[in-house]
Amino acid sequence: LNNGRVAFNAGVKAVDMLDAVLETNITCVNGASVLSPLRRSKDEQELDFLRAASRNNDAVMEDLKNFIRPGVTEKDIAKHIMFLHEKRGGVPRYPVVASGINGSMPHYGGQDNRIIQNKDIIIVDTGAWYNSYNCDMTRMFFIGDPTEEQKKVYRIVLEAQNVGEEEATLGAIPEDIDNKARKVIETAGYGAAFTHRLGHGTGMDPHEDPFIVAGNKRPLEVGNCFSIEPGIYLKGAFGVRIENLIAITETGPEVLNKLDKEMIIL
């Protein structure tokens, strides 16, 4: 490879790239512009990998119901999720486990390691690679009966998520899908609490084209696979997010996650 040109994906850390090329005459170039269009639309085999990965994710989330309880920590839950994925042959990403007030931070990274308590509400966002293809899903766990406010917020997020799935059809504009799902939350008075895009593509990379976000006007195509994941995050209180993966197929949109979207009350 001396004197050659190597394109690096956006997911490669600069320090790793330097380690790989310092002793060579390789010219490094940004490969994201090359790889992104190639990964945007999946063929049928790739979609089958994503279907199988999502079935495994469903099973992991189902098994998790038997583990979450007062007294365990967020980190305990995260480690158990990774164990469940590994047991099924997956290579897990570190999951989001955000309980109580931590759920009010959309991108909470587990730094608090809070102990689960009675009456907690917990965001669990998990995924893993199976056959090199990534799955992704978010569900909500409630320790005991939710409050009236939690029920209200959950119903709003669920309605927005359902609208997002219904609008995600062949030829639909991602920006329009985001707008219509977001409108549900805005109309309910929580627009300022929905602070991120509606969804992202997934495949070999957990976050890739197409992005379901304002400004993306490229119509959805056969082979696209992406998340629909609206959320409401109430500062200092709690958060709610619900996420499924959708694939655009020759016969129409297909929801890859089969696990029920109703509240999981333990």
Predicted segments with their positions:
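Active-site neighborhoods and metal-handling regions in enzymes and metal-associated proteins
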Residues: 1-266
